[in-house]
């Protein structure tokens, strides 16, 4: 082999060795950490780099297969050992190596171009983010990539705040952002400024506090620095805006220019010295004394007036020593000051305390006066209502009150008549008394007939309003939904015709129009009732044409009105009325709710019977019982009814599902009041039933006849405030009350059985909700029909 060939072989070998060394160099760790390449692109670059390294290693192993000892020998020995055939193989091998080297270098240049492109795109995709910590109010400005997920930002601040990252929440413009969302999804472009808020979802357990590492008003900016010839790196730098005044460490001032030259200076805030905790050791508890003279160095000097320097004495002050006082005088002065302060404070505190007592007394007297005024007003209102009931009786209770007053008057008159001396005078007086009583009963009967007619008209109007009302539902939000059906519209049309029939003082033409409308409405159905109505309409029209006066037609018009009411109450002509009839059309529905009255010999529904908890069978209806009371005893149950109503209201307010109280009837409460409690308060013996209430003896136990006490309203309020009955009352009084409870339990022993039988009955719940003062409005939730 010639010398040029040897040189070419040596150069190529050295060149391949150099290429192998360049390719086998691993990627710098700082470059890998500084680059912000996306995960997908980073994986692609890593795969390409791995493949290139494998190819280079394969070629390097093949090219460097000769031992190192051969490389150390002289070049002449290497060429002398080769033959002609060996030189040809080596030429082919060198050509292959040169071709592979060019491909590898081209591949490495592509990888480098991809990295530079990725770094440039990452550098250009950064936005400035202003983070506000809530509620600390600290603002931090830092760069952040627009395509990076928010979870990186959340983890960064979780590390700074020492809070778990899942507790932190980030919002942008009031919208909570997700962990995998980025700024670019919210329309943020690179190089823009955006503000986000960071707060804690558990502020009590993990509060957001200020970051002590960052000073007030600090900002974080990104600075590009050059780390090598063709390599740049971005570094986050914190700008601290602080009003820290650097200490003066000595220096001098130039007299001519006035410039100050300092011996030393600083630009950063000194580190905060951490506070030491309390030490519990010998050094803090033991005093070591040492006698040693020490002269401090004079580090400062006083500038006085001299040549070239003038110091003004305008601000100088002349200090004079005060009067000397001893320690005893000092302590005496302090003691006098303490006495003055305590005296003033005690006087001020006493004035405030007396003023508060005066205000409390004034409020108490005003409250007592208001209560007395309310009681007087209630008494006057009760007397006024009693007077109104006697002169304008409307309800059954009003007529009971009249019959009771009549009976009391009769008994007084009989007592006076019994004092007459002769028998003839007594008989004459009794006959006269009987005649007066008969006249009063007749007067009461006339009032009852008028009241019955008014109630009947009002009941008919209420019945028609109920039938013509649309179906109403209440939604969950409180609003109502109304719906009219063909049946409600039909009922409303019949109601309007009925109201027109009742109108008076109409002209003849208007009356004829109403009758014509009624005739067309009734003619739609043919039956005996409609035929009778049509005949009466034709008769009224005929009489009106003959000039009959209106007051002579009142009976005929009343018959038409009555028959038309029967027409409206017929479900065949008015289907909506079927839901409100007392007697249903299907006999099987009321088969189990019909009872026989042994007094009037009528079959009546169960609501017409008053069943007492102590009764064993249904015997007489309400009407027969009231009739017997009017003819014989003439008792008034109005006061007992009010007492029972107050019991219902008080038990409904407890809300503990009491049962027995709502089973009590008028006869039961009357027996309990008169026979057990003697119609008077158990404490004060007050006998006015209008002021008495029946409350629980033990407020923690359900009301029952054997767990009650009859007291006045004020006494009941004080009784229910007692924490313990045994401590609030004496032993003798408690024994007397328990004896009354035993008597009541023996009489009402059947009530617990009835209460257990109707435990799931809805009627008791309806009564409780009716008398409850805290019951919310009933809400009907509409449900959609499920597809089959």
Swiss-Prot record:
Q: Which residues form the Ubiquitin-like domain?
A: 127-203
* Taxonomic superkingdom: Eukaryota
Here the disulfide bonds are none
Q: Which cellular component, as a GO term, is one annotated location?
A: acrosomal vesicle
Q: Which GO terms describe its biological process?
A: cilium assembly; epithelial cilium movement involved in extracellular fluid movement; flagellated sperm motility; mating; smoothened signaling pathway
Where is this protein primarily located? cytoplasm
Q: What this chain does, per the record? A: Anchors the radial spoke 1 (RS1) complex to the A microtubule of outer doublet microtubules in axonemes. The triple radial spokes (RS1, RS2 and RS3) are required to modulate beating of the sperm flagellum. May play a role in inhibiting signaling via MAPK1/ERK2 and MAPK3/ERK1. Additionally, may play a role in the functioning of cilia. Not required for the functioning of tracheal or ependymal cilia.
List compositional bias (Basic and acidic residues) regions by residue number: 7-20, 68-78
Q: In which tissues is it expressed?
A: Expressed in the flagellum of sperm cells and cilia of tracheal epithelial cells (at protein level). High expression in testis, also present in brain and lung.
Q: Composition bias, kind Polar residues: at what positions?
A: 80-89
Outline the extent of the IQ domain.
334-363
Which InterPro entries is this protein grouped with? IQUB, Ubiquitin-like_domsf
Which keywords label this protein? Cell projection, Cilium, Cilium biogenesis/degradation, Cytoplasm, Cytoskeleton, Flagellum
UniProt lists compositionally biased (Acidic residues) regions at 31-54
Which species is this UniProt entry from? Mus musculus (Mouse)
Q: What is this protein called?
A: IQ motif and ubiquitin-like domain-containing protein
The segments labelled Disordered in the record are 1-89
| Localization per Swiss-Prot or TrEMBL | Cytoplasm, Cytoskeleton, Flagellum axoneme; Cell projection, Cilium
């Amino acid at each position: 082999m010639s010398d040029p060939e040897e040189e070419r072989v040596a150069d190529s070998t050295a060149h391949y060795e150099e290429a192998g060394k360049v390719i086998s160099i691993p990627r710098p760790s700082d470059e890998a950490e500084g680059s912000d390449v996306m995960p997908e692109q980073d994986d692609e670059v890593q795969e390409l780099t791995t493949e290139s390294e494998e190819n280079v290693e394969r070629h390097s192993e093949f090219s460097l297969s000769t031992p190192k000892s051969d490389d150390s020998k002289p070049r002449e020995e290497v060429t002398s050992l080769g033959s002609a055939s060996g030189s040809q193989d080596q030429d082919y091998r060198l050509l292959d190596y040169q071709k592979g080297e060019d491909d590898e270098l081209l591949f490495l240049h592509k990888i480098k171009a991809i990295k530079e492109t990725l770094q440039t795109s990452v550098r250009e995709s950064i936005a400035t983010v202003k983070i506000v910590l809530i509620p600390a109010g600290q603002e931090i400005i830092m760069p952040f990539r627009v395509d990076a997920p928010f979870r990186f930002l959340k983890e960064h601040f979780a590390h700074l705040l020492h809070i778990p990252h899942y507790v932190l929440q980030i919002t942008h413009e009031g919208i909570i952002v997700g962990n995998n969302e980025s700024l670019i999804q919210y329309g943020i472009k690179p190089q823009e400024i955006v503000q986000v808020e960071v707060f804690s979802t558990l502020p009590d357990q993990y509060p957001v506090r200020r970051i002590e590492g960052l000073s007030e008003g600090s900002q974080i900016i990104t600075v590009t620095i050059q780390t090598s010839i063709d390599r740049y790196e971005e570094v986050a730098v914190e700008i601290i805006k602080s009003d820290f005044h650097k200490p003066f460490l000595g220096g001098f001032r130039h007299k001519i220019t006035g410039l100050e030259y300092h011996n030393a200076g600083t630009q950063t805030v000194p580190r905060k010295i951490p506070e030491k905790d309390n030490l519990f050791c010998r050094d803090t508890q033991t005093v070591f004394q040492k006698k040693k003279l020490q002269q401090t160095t004079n580090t400062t000097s006083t500038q006085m007036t001299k040549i070239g320097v003038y110091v003004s004495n305008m601000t100088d002050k002349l200090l004079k020593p005060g009067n000397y006082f001893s320690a005893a005088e000092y302590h005496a002065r302090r003691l006098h000051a303490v006495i003055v302060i305590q005296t003033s404070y005690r006087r001020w505190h006493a004035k405030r305390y007396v003023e508060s007592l005066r205000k409390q007394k004034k409020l108490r007297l005003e409250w007592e006066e208001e209560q007395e005024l309310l009681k007087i007003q209630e008494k006057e209102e009760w007397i006024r209502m009693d007077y109104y009931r006697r002169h304008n009786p409307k309800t059954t209770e009003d007529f009971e009150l009249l019959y009771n007053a009549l009976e009391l008057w009769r008994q007084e008159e009989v007592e006076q008549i019994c004092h007459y001396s002769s028998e003839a005078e007594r008989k004459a007086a009794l006959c006269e008394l009987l005649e007066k009583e008969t006249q009063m009963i007749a007067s009461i009967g006339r009032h009852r007939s008028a009241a019955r007619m008014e109630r009947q008209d009002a009941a008919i109007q209420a019945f028609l309003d109920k039938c013509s009302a649309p179906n109403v539902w209440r939604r969950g939000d409180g609003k109502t939904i109304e719906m009219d059906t063909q049946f409600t519209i039909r009922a409303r049309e019949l109601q309007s015709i009925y109201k027109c029939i009742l109108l008076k003082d109409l002209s003849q033409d208007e009356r004829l129009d109403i009758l014509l409308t009624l005739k067309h409405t009734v003619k739609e159905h043919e039956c005996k009732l409609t035929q009778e109505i049509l005949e009466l309409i034709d008769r009224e029209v005929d009489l009106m044409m003959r000039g009959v006066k209106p007051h002579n037609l009142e009976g005929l018009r009343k018959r038409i009105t009555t028959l038309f009411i029967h027409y409206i109450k017929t479900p065949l002509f008015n289907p909506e009325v079927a839901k409100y009839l007392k007697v249903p059309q299907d006999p099987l529905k009321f088969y189990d709710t019909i009872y026989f009255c042994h007094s009037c010999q009528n079959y009546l529904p169960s609501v017409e019977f008053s069943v007492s908890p102590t009764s064993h069978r249904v015997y007489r209806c309400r009407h027969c019982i009231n009739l017997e009371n009017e003819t014989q005893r003439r008792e008034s149950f109005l006061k007992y009814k009010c007492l029972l109503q107050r019991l219902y209201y008080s038990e409904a307010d407890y809300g503990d599902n009491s049962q027995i109280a709502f089973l009590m009837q008028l006869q039961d409460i009357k027996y309990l009041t008169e026979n057990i409690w003697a119609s008077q308060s158990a404490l004060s013996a007050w006998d006015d039933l209008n002021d008495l209430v029946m409350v629980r003896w033990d407020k923690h136990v359900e009301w029952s006849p054997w767990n009650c006490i009859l007291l006045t309203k004020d006494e009941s309020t004080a009784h229910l405030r007692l924490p313990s009955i045994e401590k609030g009352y004496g032993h003798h009084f408690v024994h007397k009350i328990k004896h009354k409870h035993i008597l009541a339990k023996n009489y009402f022993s059947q009530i617990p059985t009835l209460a257990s039988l109707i435990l799931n009955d809805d009627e008791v719940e309806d009564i409780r909700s009716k008398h409850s003062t805290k019951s919310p409005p009933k809400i009907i939730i509409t449900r959609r029909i499920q597809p089959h």
